[in-house]
Amino acid sequence: MNLPFYIARRYLFSKKNHNAIKIISGISVCGVALATLALVCTLSVFNGFQDMVAGFFTAFDPELKITIREGKVFEPQGAAFQEVRSLPEIGVWTETLEENAMVQYKDRQAMAIIKGVEDNFEELTSIDSLLYGAGEFILHDSIVDYGVLGVELISELGTGLQFVDPLQVYAPKRNVRVNMANPSASFNRDYLFSPGVVFVVNQQKYDARYILTSLSFARNLFNYDTEVSAVELKLKPGADVTAVLRKIARILGDEFVVLDRYEQQADVFRIMEIEKFISYLFLTFILAIACFNVIGSLSMLILDKRED
C-alpha cells in the first residue's frame, strides 16, 4: 500500500547534493498547487457573485415577464391571455407600464423610468426586503398617488427619505405636436408624494432611475387607457418555470416574448459569464505553464536518478 508513496518520496527528493534540482522541483510543485487553488477559488467567487447578483434581481424582477416583440405597449386581452391567466401554475398576475419621464424636486431635475404597477406588486416580488425608511410601501390612496424612488435617484434629486413637497413628473403628450409658442402645453404634468420609503437593489440600473407608482397614475401620465408594457407573473410553489414559460410562449405565439429572470437581465449575466471565462482562460494558461515546469523538473530528476 505504501510502496507508491515510498517511490515518490525517494525519487522526488534527492539525497545527493543537487540543491538546484530540489529547489526547482519544489517551485514546480508549489506552482501547480497554487495555480490549481487560484483557479478553484476564482471560479467559486464568480459563482457566488453570480448567485448574489441573481438574488438582488430576484427581489425586484418577476419569475416570468410577457412583453410584445415589436412595439412598446399592448392590451392583455383576448382568448390567448385568458387561457394564460387560467393556467393552474399562475399564482400572481400583475400588469405594468414603464415609460421615461422627467422628474423635478424644487430646483433639481433628473430623467427617470416611471413603472406603474398594480396593488398586488408586493405579492409578485420580495420588494419589502429592499425597502428602507420609516414609512410603508403604498402606491396610492383615495386622494394622492405615491412614488417609491431608488436610493441613488433620491440622492440625485436631494429629496431625502420623506420629502414634504410633491415630486413633479413631466411626460410628453402622445400624438401631439410640440407647441413652439407654449412648449409646456405639450407635456403632461402630475405629482407624486412620498410614502416614506426607498428601495435599494444595489444595481444602478434600478437604484438610479426607477420610480414605482400605481398603474393608474402611469396610464394617466402617458395617455394610455388599458395598454400595458408587460405582464409580470409569479408561479405557484413547485411549478416548473421552464415548462410554464414554454407553455405560455406556445399559447401567445410569436407576437409576444416570455422571459425568465435570467433572460430579463441577459446583458448583466452575459458580461459575468465573459468575465468568468476570461479568468478561467488566464488561470488555465498559468496552470499549463506550471505543468511544463513540472515536466522539466521530472526530466532533471530522471537524469539525476538514472544510476539507480
Name these PLM-found stretches.
Residues S86-R209, S216-F222:
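A structural signal for hydrophobic secondary-structure junctions
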Residues V29-T42, T284-L287, C291:
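Single-pass alpha-helical transmembrane signal-anchor segments
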Residues K16-G26, P237, V241-I295, L301-D304:
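Peri-transmembrane interface segments
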Residues M1-L37:
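N-terminal Sec/SRP start-transfer signal
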Residues L64-R69, E227-R246:
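A short beta-strand structural signal in non-transmembrane regions
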Residues G78-R85, D128, V244-L252:
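Short amphipathic alpha-helices in soluble, non-transmembrane regions
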Residues F46, Q50-A80:
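Membrane-interface junction motifs in transport/secretion proteins
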Residues A38, L43-F46, Q50, C291-I302, ...:
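Membrane-embedded alpha-helices of multi-pass transport/permease systems
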